[in-house]
């Protein structure tokens, strides 16, 4: 498989890549907002956390409407990890319109959502996306979930996978395969 860092202007390149190399599984992840990776902090120098989060959700929606050659959306609320105030400026309720549009687009396109445990690893206090988003995805009819650890080091492979099943069950998912 492969992870694509979704950027709407690269849609044709992604399609060509996937046609040439028909991977079994493709994660389409959002790493950029306003052309910057939130990891660098630059985007938060000019905009407040809530503005950046909203912008990220809007850009995510644009990307998934344009790019279809992926199976699962990764890093839905990754941006929160790097905000100046992180989760203080974030909740499903604050961004429900934008998040619901993303979730509905995924569901109607037959695409899934990644549960990324790295939010816990980085001290955010929750996995990505937030459990309230997972519950909403399920309420809207979403069924496809993958679990990832966002491991950039060998020791982080499978990080907190032992709690992923219970987390998913608490959000309304009945089946989980390890």
Language-model-derived ranges and their functions:
Residues 34, 86-178:
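Charged catalytic cores and adjacent phosphate/nucleic-acid-binding surfaces used
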Residues 1-108:
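Extended substrate/RNA-proximal surfaces in nucleic-acid metabolism proteins
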């Amino acid at each position: 498989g492969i992870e694509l860092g979704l950027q709407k202007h690269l849609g044709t390149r992604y399609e060509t890549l996937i046609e040439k190399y028909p991977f079994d599984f493709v994660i389409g992840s959002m790493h950029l907002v306003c052309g910057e990776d939130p990891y660098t902090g630059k985007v938060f120098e000019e905009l407040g956390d809530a503005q950046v989060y909203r912008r990220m959700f809007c850009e995510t929606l644009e990307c998934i409407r344009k790019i279809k050659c992926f199976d699962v959306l990764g890093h839905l609320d990754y941006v929160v990890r790097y905000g100046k105030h992180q989760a203080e400026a974030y909740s499903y309720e604050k961004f429900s319109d934008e998040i619901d549009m993303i979730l509905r687009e995924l569901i109607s396109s037959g695409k899934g959502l990644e549960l990324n445990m790295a939010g816990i690893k980085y001290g955010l206090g929750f996995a990505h996306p937030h459990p309230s988003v997972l519950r909403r995805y399920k309420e809207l009819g979403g069924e496809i979930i993958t679990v990832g650890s966002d491991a950039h080091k060998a020791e982080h492979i499978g990080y907190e996978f032992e709690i992923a099943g219970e987390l998913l069950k608490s959000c309304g998912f009945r089946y989980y395969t390890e």
